[in-house]
From Swiss-Prot:
Residues 712-753, 793-813 form a coiled coil. This is SRC kinase signaling inhibitor 1. The lineage of its organism: Eukaryota, Metazoa, Chordata, Craniata, Vertebrata. The modification Phosphotyrosine is found at residues 309, 464. Residues 365-374, 381-399, 590-607, 701-710 have a biased composition (Low complexity). The gene is Srcin1. It comes from Mus musculus. Tyrosine-phosphorylated in response to EGF and to cell adhesion to integrin ligands.
Amino acid sequence: MQPWQCLRRFALAWWERTAEGRARSPREEVGPRDPGGRGEPDPERSSPPMLSADDAEYPREYRTLGGGGGGGSGGRRFSNVGLVHTSERRHTVIAAQSLEALSGLQKADADRKRDAFMDHLKSKYPQHALALRGQQDRMREQVGGWTVDPVCLLSSLCSHLHGDSTPSGAGQPAQQPNYWSFKTRSSRHTQGAQPGLADQAAKLSYASAESLETMSEAELPLGFSRMNRFRQSLPLSRSASQTKLRSPGVLFLQFGEETRRVHITHEVSSLDTLHALIAHMFPQKLTMGMLKSPNTAILIKDEARNVFYELEDVRDIQDRSIIKIYRKEPLYAAFPGSHLTNGDLRREMVYASRESSPTRRLNNLSPASHLASSSPPPGLPSGLPSGLPSGSPSRSRLSYAGGRPPSYAGSPVHHAAERLGGAPTGQGVSPSPSAILERRDVKPDEDLAGKAGGMVLVKGEGLYADPYGLLHEGRLSLAAAAETHSHTRARAACTSGVPCALSAPTPLPRCSPTWRTRCTRRALAALYGDGYGFRLPPSSPQKLADVSAPSGGPPPPHSPYSGPPSRGSPVRQSFRKDSGSSSVFAESPGGKARSTGSASTAGAPPSELFPGPGERSLVGFGPPVPAKDTETRERMEAMEKQIASLTGLVQSALLRGSEPETPSEKVEGSNGAATPSAPVCGSGSKSSGATPVSGPPPPSASSTPAGQPTAVSRLQMQLHLRGLQNSASDLRGQLQQLRNVQLQNQESVRALLKPTEADVSMRVSEAARRQEDPLQRQRTLVEEERLRYLNDEELITQQLNDLEKSVEKIQRDVAHNHRLMPGPELEEKALVLKQLGETLTELKAHFPGLQSKMRVVLRVEVEAVKFLKEEPQRLDGLLKRCRGVTDTLAQIRRQVDEGMWPPPNNLLNQSPKKVAAETDFSKGLDFEIPPPSPPLNLHELSGPAEGTPLTPKSTNPTKCLDASSKRNTDKAVSVEAAERDWEEKRAALTQYSAKDINRLLEETQAELLKAIPDLDCASKTHPGPAPTPDHKPPKAPHGQKAAPRTEPSGRRGSDELTVPRYRTEKPSKSPPPPPPRRSFPSSHGLTTTRTGEVVVTSKKDSVFIKKAESEELEVQKPQVKLRRAVSEVVRPASTPPIMASAIKDEDDEERIIAELESGGSSVPPMKVVTPGASRLKAAQGPAGSPDKGKHGKQRTEYMRIQAQQQATKPSKEVSGPNETSSPGSEKPSGSRTSIPVLTSFGARNSSISF
């Protein structure tokens, strides 16, 4: 078409519109029109069966630009799909005057923009400068005072001109269908004579998109379907009195970053009026449906508080109010991939080439917008719908939905139509990025009817290569897939194709029945009866995936609805190659023979497949559900809202990250209802071009007839909903599994970390405790002080060395050279020497303090060393004592058996000798045995004999001897075995020296002599002797200070132990001894030590062993510190670890300091307790004191025993294994003889019971 033709049509169109009157409904649809039938009214323009109930009131006419040669197709009319709310229509009807006023206010600005734009076009297209200039003049004349948006108007012209400059093939631009997705309501009379508006509109988006790259988006209301965004009948007032000029004055409308100032001449009486005004002022961005959507909020500014709040009452709008429109952005707005415009293909199915920028995405709406609602003329083959239903009121969005790629800016579409025999070709639709940005989410607001047609982007770049293709990452509104049942049916009817390449345009492929059936099963086909006529639910990605592959034949090289691939794209080339491939399509609604025509046409379903009332062919979509079907409408609206979010989730889960190669297969697989992906037929809902464009299609499945449209749509809706529910439940299950796995991982990690954490915390706490431990801190401080001391000492030593060397040198010089040294030098040396002496003196004075501190710190180490050194000696001493006690007992038993008692003078003669020996022994033992903690209860252990201690007079010697002899025979064997064991264990121990023995004997003698004056008090029965000064330990022989003895002891009384009780008693804290055994009184020299060993001793050793036994008993009383005066030998610890009480006791510290200062160690006192004296009394309190009566009894018995021993010949050698110990030693005191033995400290009375 030549530029002048385009301009002429343009002018005629506007003239017609102006003449028709201002009150006309603003929703008139400028459908594709037949250039041949330009001025003829279309006989079928108002076919009642295709009108929704909503449209009956305002019939709408759609002119069709049928393909030039396609006989009968030229005059088709499409009834409005009903995409406009009734309220919106009412407002638009009564607001013509307001629109006039608005247009008048902006006329000057519009003229200026128009002139500037025409100049821009002339400079850019000099070859059309003449035509443009003439057209500019004619427009000024024709349009007159009516304000035309110059950008929209002239961009259409520019598009047309640019389209001519592209290879258009056969020069039939008139066949270019009008792809405006906005339905305009026609006046009640026909508009038959509108010249090629559709052609101009179709080209508008492409050419103007390229030519207007420099224009701002705000200034480009491009591609508005009615040529001018200023609606003649803009609804500004709802009230009957439109003459009332109670205007708010000026309003400021803000949307995004744009602000528009509006002069209002009429009162804004309702939200609908405000919506219409906003949609008018932001044509490319907002529509009535969007404004009424819950995703859009209209805010008004509170100047007092400087905040925006939601506008609920239009009466709040006053002069100079600021109204802000906030629209929630869709989740996928940030992704440039192919999305549905706002997720709804139905809304704007516009081509979006990958070269075209968002500002250039003009609304190249496909005829799809008319397919859904149009009822084709009876004579028109149903297989050739002249448009695709993409009918959506969102004109503004479509204007930005992007134009075709520059390569496709011409009118090549018509060639396909020509090939089809004049079938009008429908341009593919692709979502507009800007519109997508406006969507808050999959928006359930607008009709889906046209959507299905819009979804037909199949294999073109719109889907396959176009970044703004259909499915890709966008959230498809169910409507997009809603090319569902109606899509499937429409698919069958959709024959208008868009050639993919200019050189090889291919007609629109029709959908094979199989594809249709699949779509029917899967798509949400419910026709919405929502104030927009009927609408389809927004489709989900699954729907798109299904639509993506028709099963009827080879994949159409270029889906008629898909955006044409760019010139160089392989897709395009493959389309050219494959364009000849044939597919079957139905020629007529009656299901006439399907001509295997040009490649990309797939057969439309014969009308019998979707029989509609009145035999109407389901062009684009089946017969619409009447708007009054409120049940369907409400249900679908509710489901759309619920499913919209699920759709986005499912699609993002299935398609995110899967680029054009596999998304459709994935979606189909997830839906589970799709057959193997087959090339999409005319319905370009191929999701992101999943199937390769040139790939062979899968074999077509047999077509299955679909039921009635309504039933099919409901079935499809249920199936689709079920699929979505399954997908959602699967996703929930996977999410739950992921959560469980994550929880398990966390638990395992915790389990791994727990021991590590415990170990680390233990180490840290241990380190901190060590750091905070007073002993450790003290040790650290002492060590630092010692190092300082050593440094000072080293320095002094160095200085002294230097001084010595210098002095020696001087001395040598004087001796050899005989020269006199100068006095000052000598004085200097003397001064240095004096300083050194002073420093050394200070160092020496400092040493004692350091020494005492180090002693305290090193006490544990010192005692450990002592223990290691002295333990062998102690063991030897214990062994000797055991032997001595054994000898003594053997001698006593012999005396008892023979009835021979030594005279008292023998005992007295022997006692000094023994005492001396014992004293020497105790002096020689260089160890101390800290007693074990709990003092033993002596009364418990002593048994009934304690209460009535017997004196020698009360004992019947004969009875005692008889009982003893009987017991000895019973115990002989065990005693012999124990004796052998003891001998084996102690064989290696060395014997004490005579010096030690003598010292022990002397000490014992001294104690015995001190106790002799108490013999008179033998009648006292309960022993509770208190320590007296006589019993205090003597000072050490060397004169060192002895540690004071302050501890009261329960053992200070008589330490009698009955043999059986003593057998069961165990030392509480002494070094681990062998299991304790009893001392068996025997007349043959056998006895057992405190530690359980049986030894054979001679009479001479008895005193020493008594003392050792007494000491060993003391081991069990750690509270009682047995200290001797300091001696030269290092004192060992009684046990390798020092008792805490011993460490902390001040007396103990003083003793250790004294030991270290003297360089020796304390000689531990030796408490000699014979094994027989091991019987303890429970009644003896811890602080009990020895009883004088008990002392007297014990002394008497001791003197008597000494006399017996002197009478009998004592043998030092063990005679023992032949003799037996008396088993009856456990008998009451009547058969027992007690031998009192005083320890070296005299504070304890020990008795040997047998």
